[in-house]
Amino acid sequence: MIVGLGVDIVELARIEKSLTRFGRRFAEKVLSPEEMAAMPTLTVNYIAGRFAVKEAAVKALGTGFSQGIGPTLVETVATSGGKPQLRLHGAALQCARDLGVTSCHVSISHDRSSAVAVVVLEAL
């Protein structure tokens, strides 16, 4: 049964503006250490896609970025085949457990001006 659904669209120009202004500090504020390590350079598409997943995930959880859930507690990791997977930590993980979440589905897409992500949370 679906217990959460979230969608988010991020304008690449907004991320580019933040990177220009704040550089690596911006990326470190919104990406987990593992996401930072997986990023070869500070790329707008990578950061925008990951941020869209984070926003979609907290919408699916029904919390937004509140209740102790910050961007670094929601991360996107790739399987060996490159498929994006959601990994939650801390308050985000506890919220998912409270909802009975047993599986998460993630999709990310980009075009010239935006990144979009969809997150579906399922429970048995």
Swiss-Prot record:
Principal subcellular localisation of the protein: cytoplasm
First-level EC class: transferase
MF annotations from Gene Ontology: holo-[acyl-carrier-protein] synthase activity; magnesium ion binding
Gene Ontology CC: cytoplasm
CC cofactor: Mg(2+)
Any Gene Ontology biological process: fatty acid biosynthetic process
Gene3D superfamilies noted in UniProt: 4'-phosphopantetheinyl transferase domain
E.C. code: 2.7.8.7
Pfam families: ACPS (PF01648)
Localization of this protein: Cytoplasm
InterPro entries noted in UniProt: 4-PPantetheinyl_Trfase_dom, 4-PPantetheinyl_Trfase_dom_sf, ACPS, Ppantetheine-prot_Trfase_dom
Ligand binding (Mg(2+)): 8, 55
Keyword Aminoacyl-tRNA synthetase: no
Record carries keyword Ribonucleoprotein: no
Catalytic reaction equation(s): apo-[ACP] + CoA = holo-[ACP] + adenosine 3',5'-bisphosphate + H(+)
Keyword line: Cytoplasm, Fatty acid biosynthesis, Fatty acid metabolism, Lipid biosynthesis, Lipid metabolism, Magnesium, Metal-binding, Transferase
Task of the protein: Transfers the 4'-phosphopantetheine moiety from coenzyme A to a Ser of acyl-carrier-protein.
Similarity-based family: Belongs to the P-Pant transferase superfamily. AcpS family.
NCBIfam families in UniProt: acpS (TIGR00516), pantethn_trn (TIGR00556), PRK14657.1 (NF011251)
Protein name: Holo-[acyl-carrier-protein] synthase
Species whose genome carries this gene: Desulfovibrio desulfuricans (strain ATCC 27774 / DSM 6949 / MB)
